[in-house]
Amino acid sequence: MTSVNIIALVLAGGEGARLLPLTAEHAKPALPFVNGCRIVDFVLSNLANSEISPIYVLAQYKPQSLLRHIETTWNKSSRGGNCSVNVVLPRTGAERFLGTADAVYRNLDLIERHRPDLVAVFASDHVYRMDVRQMVDFHLARGADVSVAAVPVPIEKAYSFGIIVSDHDHRIRDFQEKPDRPVPLPADPDRAYASMGNYLFNARLLVDVLCRANRRGETDFGRHILPHASRSHRAFAYDFTGNHVPGVRSHEERAYWRDVGTLEAYTGARRDALGPQPRFHLENSQWPIRGIRPLEGQRELARRSRSRDGLLTHDSVDARPRPINVPREIYESIAHGMQASA
């Protein structure tokens, strides 16, 4: 394992508008997934299992349930191990984060305080397992200034992602944020190379590019920082399909990764984690997802998922109406999960 000083900044401040009405009162990373864990537990577990600490979660929108979950599951529990997880909020209401890059820029004091070699800037709304140290090794071996974790996605869905154009040695030649006409992979016209929203930066470079971006009024990694970096610095794409995590079962989908930013994707990922041979098995003693309870109730959730023909309009949870576009099992999970952490 490579020995370098790394801190992690987890981006958790977005409003999650595509997941409304679930995110009307809760931050997207705090939404329950399956069996007790929240969406944010996947990135935190990957960083903790990779022995990267400290971790700072940059929150903003509806942060109360996220704060409560991290405090009880990570900071007041043995599940957190030796990993330090801290939630950082905007200092005043007038200083709300204007974008992903602005969120990090407003917290550059964390980098100055720890003086790391590398800064991991990771998204908080994806379901996956990843050994981040393998990406660190790739970054160092390439002499990279910035590395972007990437995964092939179907070309018809690529417009929803930041798309990477790279050459044979993974050097990024162009970065296009949610393009109307995504550039396909050279050897596979049906797929494009998508950013996972996980970045490694040399610390000094990150401070410099964010200060320059702030002077230009640029606030977003995908729209501003990465397109510039791909032209002016050594930027590389780390192929997530080559990341190997111990304990993955033979029936699981290799290099499983899902962006759960829509109701359809969120529901689909939950179903992938259910059943006797799930695509993504939540239990893995060699790479645990912190916050997971024993899989009680898994069969019942799977039964509901399989038997659902349509979307009902009401549920018995607290005798409150359920929005018509939210499946029963999703609404019940949200209601019960939030009650449990209250």
Q: Model segments located where?
A:
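N-terminal glycine-rich phosphate-binding loop and ensuing alpha1 helix
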Residues: 2-75, 83, 92-94, 110, ...
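Active-site-proximal specificity loops/subdomain of glycosyltransferases
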Residues: 82-104
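Well-ordered alpha-helical segments embedded in enzymatic catalytic cores
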Residues: 39-43, 102-106, 225
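Active-site acidic Asp-centered loop
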Residues: 122-124
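Left-handed beta-helix
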Residues: 1-7, 204, 211-342
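Conserved core of the sugar-phosphate nucleotidyltransferase
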Residues: 115, 129-204, 213-215
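Short aromatic/hydrophobic "clamp" motif used to bind/position activated sugar donors
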Residues: 119
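Short aromatic/basic micro-patch
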Residues: 97, 129, 200, 220, ...
